[in-house]
Each structure stands twice: as C-alpha cells, then as structure tokens.
C-alpha cells in the first residue's frame, strides 16, 4: 500500500479557511477621528495629521486573514501598531472604521452583551505582564476564567489541572505568585488562558520580559501545546527569531500599516521592501530557519506491510531511487532503496527498512535549525526524514533544496 504525501505545515482540516478576516481597519486617536478618513485627509501623512489636526493614526487601512488552526505572528518595532491591532480584534480598543469577522461573528456589529459573551466564551489573552492575583494560589489564578463563567469548583479545578499539567506546573497548585519565577508566572497565565478552551488565543509579547533561556523554553512549550490543541493564535512580538520559530505566517507592521505578510522563509529570504529587509540583513538565516521551513513532501512513501512489488512500482512511478517506509500510524520506520526492495521478501519491508536506515540520515524534528541540519544532510546521499514528536513522518529535506535555500541566503 502506498500513501499520499503528507502536508508539512499544520494539522488543520481546512488550512486555508479564514477564521479571522480583517478588512480596511483603521484606528485613529484624537477628537473626531473619522476626519482622518476623509478624501481630503486620506493622502496626508501621519506626521501631518498629528501636527495639523491633533490626530494620531494607530492603524491605517489594515487587511489580512488568519486561517483556522494557524499561528499568525504580528511583528514590528515599538509604535508600529501591533499591540493596538491585537486589542482592536476584540474591541478592547475601539476601531475607528473597518470590518472584523471572527468565525462568522461580526465583531464591529456586536452589541455590548454580544461582545462580552464573545470575549468571555471564545477568546483568551496572555500579556507580557502576567496579571496574576497575589492573594490567590496557582490553581485559583489559573481557574479564574472558569470561575467568572460560573463553572462549579470541582469541575473547574479538574479542567484547570489538565492545563497546569500541560504547561509543566504539576505540583505547584498551592503556591502563590510571589513564590514563582517569571517563567513560572507566565506559565500560570498561559494555563489560565487555555483552561477556558478558547477558540482564539491572543498573545501580546508574552515572553518578552523573560530571560533568553526561559524564553526559549516557553517557546518550546507553546509549540508543543499548539501541536496538541491546534488553536488559532495571534502572537505579537518584536523579535524576528521568535516570529520565525513560532509563526506559520508573519505580518510585519510599519507605522500602523502592514508592510508584508508571508511565511517565515518569505520574510527572511524574499523581503518585499527595504524596511522588511532591515529586519533580516544582519541575521544568519541558517541559525533561524528550521527544517519545517524547507522540508517538502516525500516523493514516495510506502507502508511497512506493502508487498515488495508494489513498493518497487511506487518508487519507479515517483521517479525516485528510495522510499520512506511508515507503519499504519505513519510512524517512520526507515528508508528503502530500490536495491533493498528487490532483495526483500513478502512481509520483510520493515526489517529491510530498519537495516537500510543505518546508512541513512537520522530523523530530525521540524524545529531543528538549518545550521544543525547541514552536516547531517551533507553526510548522506539520501534525504533527511523529518518527524514529529510522535515519530510520524512529516516530510523530507534533500540536499538540493537545502543548497538552494543557503545560496539564496548568501
């Protein structure tokens, strides 16, 4: 039995489905802010509007979509409008004009009660400042969202315990915020957000105040949690390395406008203007880009219970010289060349794949950097298999693709 190629990005059933749709969004601060949108003033610059009318443009005609199950990163310098944008999405800051649709709900058209129900039932936010209540222990802080929903104590504690376990705080339930490190306090904030089982998770520079090592650990936790829960996430940051590591797509903002939207490799390798290029000009691409950014579908994947004749036919049909062998759960078993397939008898593909993989590259995780990947890829004639944390095949990296990426980087 042969298998269809596996998409290397995300696990959403409908990866192109727009969960959030933002169109022509404006936020202007000041008296009678709609003046900035008139035909007379639309072409005037931000500085001119501020000096002549006393209006400050926070967001200027912003449009984008966020797909269901996607981690969408909004990145920019201080004052670029990224934090204003994330607050406008749920009208914590009231937009001046534009349209915001979240999973079919018209946010701009919602009345006070509808907006409150939407925020309380479908969205959670995590800020850079943890916002923990000092007189409440970890359990009561993390279960706060469920408590204000009126969830009974036993039920909310059980749900919250699952999230505390997920973020690595098992055993700290009775501790108070003053007894926790910054990283642990932020884990409480993340558990509090996840406990309400939100459809949409808004994270506004949640790791910016943490030490570099703790920050990386928290990024690892978020990646792991997203693999399990597959939430729709809007993540705000000013750090390119963080944006590339976490984001399925990245929007770079400048002066309240979106300068470029693209996948991480597009932002790093193909900036659309000088402003975006400035973010990446001093970056060692191979230290930021990871396997998931360059991996492709394996041209030939066969099941370990396939008959050799069928496996050989699949390899030849794909125009390949080897096949990636997986079991019924798509767990990676090994690599088989055409010669090894010909030598295998019925029921022997798995054993031959395991032996044949001794000379093939070891499987790597999607978040391994190209810097770490290069020596592995160069040491073998075979492509490097990329597997998730359950050992399931996600894609491959061949030397040609890797070389092309590096040459573009240089």
Place the predicted regions along the sequence by residue.
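Conserved ABC ATPase "signature" region
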Residues: 37-48, 105-106, 143, 147, ...
């Amino acid at each position: 039995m042969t298998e269809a190629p596996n998409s290397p990005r995300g696990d959403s059933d409908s990866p192109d489905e727009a969960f959030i749709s933002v169109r022509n969004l404006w936020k202007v601060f000041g008296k009678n802010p709609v003046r900035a949108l008139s035909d007379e003033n639309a072409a005037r610059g931000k500085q001119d509007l501020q000096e002549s009318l006393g209006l400050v443009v926070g967001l200027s005609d912003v449009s984008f979509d966020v797909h269901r199950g996607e981690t969408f990163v909004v990145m920019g310098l201080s004052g670029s409008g990224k934090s204003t944008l994330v607050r406008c999405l749920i009208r914590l800051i009231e937009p001046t004009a534009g349209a915001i649709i979240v999973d079919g709900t018209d946010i701009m058209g919602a009345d006070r009660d509808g907006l409150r129900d939407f925020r309380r039932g479908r969205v959670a936010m995590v800020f850079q400042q943890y916002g923990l209540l000092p007189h409440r222990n970890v359990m009561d802080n993390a279960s706060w969202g469920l408590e204000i929903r009126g969830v009974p104590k036993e039920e909310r504690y059980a749900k919250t315990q699952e999230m505390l376990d997920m973020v690595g705080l098992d055993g700290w339930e009775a501790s108070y915020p003053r007894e926790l490190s910054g990283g642990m306090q932020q884990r409480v904030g993340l558990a509090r957000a996840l406990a309400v089982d939100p459809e949409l998770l808004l994270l506004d520079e949640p790791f910016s105040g943490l030490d570099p090592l703790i920050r990386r650990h928290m990024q690892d936790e978020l990646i792991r949690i997203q693999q399990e829960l597959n939430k729709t996430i809007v993540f705000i940051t000013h750090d390119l390395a963080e944006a590339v590591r976490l984001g399925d797509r990245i929007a770079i903002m400048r002066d309240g406008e979106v300068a470029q939207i693209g996948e991480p490799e597009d932002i790093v390798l193909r900036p659309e203007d000088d402003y975006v290029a400035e973010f990446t000009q001093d970056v060692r691409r191979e230290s930021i880009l990871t396997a998931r950014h360059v991996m492709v579908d394996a041209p030939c994947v066969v099941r370990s219970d396939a008959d050799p004749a069928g496996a050989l036919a699949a390899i030849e049909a794909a125009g390949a010289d080897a096949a990636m062998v997986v079991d019924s759960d798509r767990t990676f078993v090994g690599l088989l060349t055409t010669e090894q397939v010909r030598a295998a008898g019925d029921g022997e593909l798995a054993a031959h794949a395991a032996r044949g993989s001794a000379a093939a590259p070891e499987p790597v995780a999607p978040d391994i950097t190209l810097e770490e990947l290069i020596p592995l890829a160069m040491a073998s004639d075979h492509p490097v298999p990329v597997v998730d944390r359950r050992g399931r095949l996600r894609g491959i990296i061949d030397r040609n693709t890797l070389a092309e990426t590096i040459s573009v980087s240089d």
